[in-house]
């Protein structure tokens, strides 16, 4: 039964690749300036280069990957071009950071999620607006949009001035199990990509959003290197599984626990 599902996913993804082969993050297309108002870029006070992405979920909170944690994080909102900033672009620093575990431990398949409270809230503007948490998990075969300022070539790194976007698909978890050794039987992650290769998130895209049918479903966590290999889809933290923890933390319950 698993083999049948995997083969069915391969057919779906091959058809998607044939239809959308020009849309790549690795060597791919610039995002529309109006489609990523919730996308934020993370950098540190020591380096101006964006090293991770994140997602604005309300005027005061940003969601990203736990492995994107650094000292002296700076959060850039309302950005498109780094060289020519939008007039409404803003910079914030985190007031608080929240992790699933107090030890900040996470694995490639578990709890790679970090919630940051901004020191000062932001207002909606032309290029800044939050995205809602998902009301339901995505289904296998869903077309999703991945985006970020990560490298557009791999293994050599080429960082773009503007965010790049690509359409990828939700796959059965078993596809990622077959592609990446060591994954457990179940995990709170999503498997997403194009089995034929060419479309993928990459270094610098970590922590950024996976948007499926208009809903924020995933956080870019990890994948193969070089990026964009055939039969090597990416792994994304499954946001839906953490919505209760996120909402409880935002409501002030700092003792909220993540799902086991």
Swiss-Prot record:
Monomer. InterPro entries: Peptidase_S1_PA, Peptidase_S1_PA_chymotrypsin, Peptidase_S1A, Trypsin_dom, TRYPSIN_HIS, TRYPSIN_SER. Glycans are attached at residues 123-124. Disulfide bonds join 31-165, 52-68, 100-258, 144-212, 176-191, 202-227. The active site is at 67 (charge relay system), 112 (charge relay system), 206 (charge relay system). It comes from Gloydius ussuriensis. This is Snake venom serine protease gussurobin. Residues 1-18 form the signal peptide.
